[in-house]
Amino acid sequence: MFAYIKGTVEEKNNDSIIVEAGGIGYRIFTALSTINNMGQNGTTVKIYTHYYVREDIAVLYGFGTVEELTMFEMLLTVSGVGPKAAISMISTLSPSRFYLAVVSQDTKSLTKAPGIGMKMAQRIILDLKDKISKEQLTSSIPMTSPENNEVTGDSVLSEAVSALMVLGYGSAEASSTISGIYEKGISVEELVKKALKSL
């Protein structure tokens, strides 16, 4: 119904924000990390939205990036995963880390999200592992400076996994191999060379 809403932040709560656009105040439920990135009241923001309707419930969920929205909608296709669990996952893992966790069948990372137990993590992996493309593994990682080690590490991991997939290796095999030999500060080229030797 709404692709995004652009307006001013009027109120921030623990689980939602109110954005005024065209004289209408929209209550948008979102991850705490997104709320914290929205700036102070009066700030102009653009928030991507998903209009969730079930029986007598109609709720707007919002996201700071298209990648988070895509991740949310992908999670909703999993049996037993509702909006709250999906938001919990987004609050815990970035899209790139989530995709890597799924294709490498890393249940430990998935269960870090509040409300996601082992059975749910296994179901998420089973339902989504074949739906995640190599483009999704890399497209959600923002360009950043080397000082940001966490994001740079994500980028190296994802690019290395993508390179192995281009060479014909399966996503789960590539992710598992790369995760097992990754070292802080290693380049994509070095990581791929090491991976090819171990495969």
From Swiss-Prot:
Residues 65-143 are annotated as: Domain II. Residues 144-151 are annotated as: Flexible linker. GO terms for biological process: DNA recombination; DNA repair. Keywords: Cytoplasm, DNA damage, DNA recombination, DNA repair, DNA-binding. Residues 152-199 are annotated as: Domain III. SMART domains: HhH1. Residues 1-64 are annotated as: Domain I. Transmembrane segments: none annotated. One of its GO terms (cellular component) is Holliday junction helicase complex. GO terms for molecular function: ATP binding; four-way junction DNA binding; four-way junction helicase activity. Its main location: cytoplasm. Pfam families: HHH_5, RuvA_C, RuvA_N. It comes from the Bacteria. Has three domains with a flexible linker between the domains II and III and assumes an 'L' shape. Domain III is highly mobile and contacts RuvB. Homotetramer. Forms an RuvA(8)-RuvB(12)-Holliday junction (HJ) complex. HJ DNA is sandwiched between 2 RuvA tetramers; dsDNA enters through RuvA and exits via RuvB. An RuvB hexamer assembles on each DNA strand where it exits the tetramer. Each RuvB hexamer is contacted by two RuvA subunits (via domain III) on 2 adjacent RuvB subunits; this complex drives branch migration. In the full resolvosome a probable DNA-RuvA(4)-RuvB(12)-RuvC(2) complex forms which resolves the HJ. The RuvA-RuvB-RuvC complex processes Holliday junction (HJ) DNA during genetic recombination and DNA repair, while the RuvA-RuvB complex plays an important role in the rescue of blocked DNA replication forks via replication fork reversal (RFR). RuvA specifically binds to HJ cruciform DNA, conferring on it an open structure. The RuvB hexamer acts as an ATP-dependent pump, pulling dsDNA into and through the RuvAB complex. HJ branch migration allows RuvC to scan DNA until it finds its consensus sequence, where it cleaves and resolves the cruciform DNA. This is Holliday junction branch migration complex subunit RuvA. It comes from Ruminiclostridium cellulolyticum (strain ATCC 35319 / DSM 5812 / JCM 6584 / H10) (Clostridium cellulolyticum). The gene is ruvA.
